[in-house]
Amino acid sequence: MKQLLDFLPLVIFFAVYKFYDIYAATGVLIAATAIQLVITYLIYKHIEKMHLATFAMVTVFGSLTLFFHDDAFIKWKVSIVYALFAIGLIASQIMGKSALKSMLGKEMKVDDRIWAQVTWYWVGFFVLCSFANIYIAFNLPLETWVNFKVFGLTALTLINTVITVVYLYKNMQDDNSQPTDNQ
């Protein structure tokens, strides 16, 4: 349910873009993301920081897109969000606290070395997605960018999530093993 709720603004953005234009889709994206936060809070009584950050980025860059009637702002938002995810993972790794371990460590007991590998894998993924978005957004037609944003990046993220889970599962410790450094 939560994952479906996460994708709802993106699906609505795509549908509105197909029937209207990028500006209508951007306005609806801002509204849908706000509604998503409200629904998430009503159901789970909690809103994750990532959702708040995403809402802030959508609101700022979406508003700039609408105010200046320039789709470059909403295109940049995608790359900036991915770059911020990469920076956040790097910062957490440097501080010795894996953000991914914090999110998944209770379900998946693996060595800290594995968490570090997975973190750097995702840093690379986010950086590549950020640059791919810039290239596609500013060198290919708008419709290609919208399709890439909605389907390409979503598919790539799902594929990388599966790869990560398989890798973590393959490296899981049994319950009788010694705890890792930060457990």
Curated annotation (Swiss-Prot):
The chain crosses the membrane at residues 22-42, 50-70, 72-92, 118-138, 148-168. It comes from the Bacteria. It is a multi-pass membrane protein. One of its GO terms (cellular component) is plasma membrane. Keywords: Cell inner membrane, Cell membrane, Membrane, Transmembrane, Transmembrane helix. It is found in: Cell inner membrane. It holds the Pfam family IspA. Plays a role in cell envelope biogenesis, maintenance of cell envelope integrity and membrane homeostasis. Belongs to the YciB family. This is Inner membrane-spanning protein YciB. The gene is yciB.
